[in-house]
Amino acid sequence: MKGLILVGGYGTRLRPLTLTVPKPLVEFGNRPMILHQIEALAAAGVTDIVLAVNYRPEVMVETLKKYEDEFGVSITFSVETEPLGTAGPLKLAESVLKKDNSPFFVLNSDVICDYPFKELADFHQAHGGKGTIVATKVDEPSKYGVIVHDIATPNLIDRFVEKPVEFVGNRINAGLYILNPEVIDLIDLKPTSIEKETFPILVEQKSLYSFDLEGYWMDVGQPKDFLSGTVLYLNSLSKRDPAKLAKGENIVGNVLVDPTAKISPTAKVGPDVVIGPNVVIGDGVRITRSVALSNSHIKDHALVKSTIIGWNSTVGKWARLEGVTVLGDDVEVKDEIYINGGKVLPHKSISVNVPKEAIIM
């Protein structure tokens, strides 16, 4: 089987982290975001994976080619000279995706969930249609494009309603699909949208179905959702592989800690925290609902809440960070500084308080 991951472009919503590395290589749960997807595809029997990229492909190649042997897959890069939307990349990768008659998976690189690829493939084969969309239930469907089903046929999609005013359903497109190769014949090699241009054709042909996703789902393409997704991911990990989570008197709730990190016994870590490689956490530190990326240092008695601390960054003594603050690479926050919702670009030194949301350039 085959899979295509829509990697896309600049990752502007996740800046300042994506000023240093492409978004799929930002560590989520202490490994590059895209690796969660590659591993799940490989586990479902996928042997050929195409990454559709249009930004810094050389960095992606250098980082990801080494995982081919580990997961037993072939990883190829389909490089767009201009952004091709969500359907164009399928046409560009036609030679790989149509190399045999088996269906192929398509997924957005921002999506984190317990990927149900094996079950999805079985469901797709059973209904005999040309495409299947993974659907997830949401509390506020009015923000999304909602899937409406055919009354007579279970799971057959009748139409999509964009941001409905009245309740028509609560299932939305989760950004994961399985499609038959002939779907590529419906796509032109130009910037096109699979959601707006390709799927409506399949709906008209009564050949597009939806598969309900069980468990958590999150598009982690921006900082607040990255942190919310981390909470959901750690909760899922606590159920399916609890041995991976940290234990100890100073650990509260679900916490993932790289073995090379050094945490003071008087620090209190958690709940919902990820600590990366070579991170140092000083005496009396309190950190909750946050991510500390590799080689960062949180000094004594700092308070860190709802924050992403970038690689090689330092948080000073008695500093306080909260409100979805994001530090880019190699940022220094001086002692006793308060930052509330600041987005700090790489290589900055912060010596004055940032009391409300701001971009520090």
Swiss-Prot record:
Keyword Nucleotidyltransferase: yes
Pfam families (UniProt xref): GMPPB_C, NTP_transferase
SUPFAM superfamilies: Nucleotide-diphospho-sugar transferases
Record flagged with keyword RNA-binding: no
GO molecular function terms noted in the UniProt entry: GTP binding; mannose-1-phosphate guanylyltransferase (GTP) activity
Record-linked InterPro entries: GMPPB_C, GMPPB_N, Hexapep_transf_CS, Mannose-1P_guanyltransferase, NTP_transferase_dom, Nucleotide-diphossugar_trans
EC class: transferase
Alphabetized Gene3D superfamilies for the sequence: Hexapeptide repeat proteins, Spore Coat Polysaccharide Biosynthesis Protein SpsA, Chain A
One GO cellular component term: cytoplasm
Broad class of the protein's primary localization: cytoplasm
Subcellular location: Cytoplasm
Single biological process term from Gene Ontology: GDP-mannose biosynthetic process
Catalytic activity, EC: 2.7.7.13
Pathway where it operates: Nucleotide-sugar biosynthesis; GDP-alpha-D-mannose biosynthesis; GDP-alpha-D-mannose from alpha-D-mannose 1-phosphate (GTP route): step 1/1
Reactions catalysed: alpha-D-mannose 1-phosphate + GTP + H(+) = GDP-alpha-D-mannose + diphosphate
Keywords, comma-separated and alphabetical: Cell cycle, Cytoplasm, GTP-binding, Nucleotide-binding, Nucleotidyltransferase, Transferase
Family of the protein in this entry: Belongs to the transferase hexapeptide repeat family.
Known function: Involved in cell wall synthesis where it is required for glycosylation. Involved in cell cycle progression through cell-size checkpoint.
Protein's recorded name: Mannose-1-phosphate guanyltransferase
Source species: Kluyveromyces lactis (strain ATCC 8585 / CBS 2359 / DSM 70799 / NBRC 1267 / NRRL Y-1140 / WM37)
UniProt gene name: MPG1
